[in-house]
A protein has these predicted regions:
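Acidic (Asp/Glu-rich) sequence patches and key acidic residues
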Residues: 1-178
Length: 178
């Protein structure tokens, strides 16, 4: 017997990424026709209802993250980043803000945005892949995340690494604009 064991943390990237991960599981099953056991906290694997998964799991999770940030800042607790790879550089802390993959944010501002615009609008900017398909927002958010997390803001001629990340950012921005 062949056993394939995998784990995928999808909260940081969004509902579209979660769906893509489940699609890969489906393709593996089709290729090899073996039995599967999938544990899916979002219940998407069982129900295949994208909107339900996105609103009941991902939007609730984002709301909880925003509330946690606000609570921690009110308690004067140190919280410099959310959803940030701890193996990457950490931008300098600025009081009242936290760093995320889409920039430096003020949690109170996010609460106001949720009240004024709804969680959906914030989610479309926060999650790299919030929609079912790789759409313009996916490419925009991918570019902005790379710009914030990986870019040295140096000319491509400086190094191979600079050329690769700069090209990646430009390529994704062009796809977003197309």
């Amino acid at each position: 017997d062949i056993a394939v064991i995998g784990d995928c943390q999808t909260n940081l990237l969004g509902a579209g990424f979660h769906k893509a991960a489940i699609d890969i599981v489906d393709e593996l099953v089709e290729l090899r026709d073996f039995s599967t056991e999938v544990e899916d906290d979002t219940e998407y694997y069982e129900h295949r209802d994208f909107e339900r998964m996105r609103s009941e799991h991902f939007y609730r999770w984002l709301n909880a993250i925003v509330e946690l940030c606000c609570e921690r800042l009110k308690e004067n607790c140190s919280m410099s980043a959310i959803c940030w790879d701890c193996n990457k550089y950490m931008p300098r802390g600025i009081e009242g803000t936290v760093v995320s993959s889409f920039g430096r944010i003020c949690p109170e501002h996010l609460v106001e945005r949720i009240k004024d615009e709804g969680i959906e609008r914030l989610a479309s900017e926060f999650f790299m892949w919030n929609n079912e398909e790789r759409d313009a927002l996916f490419y925009r958010n991918t570019a902005l995340s790379a710009l914030w997390e990986d870019c040295y803001f140096m000319p491509s001629a400086r190094s191979e690494e600079d050329m690769e990340i700069n090209s990646f950012i430009i390529e994704n921005l062009e796809k977003a604009a197309a």
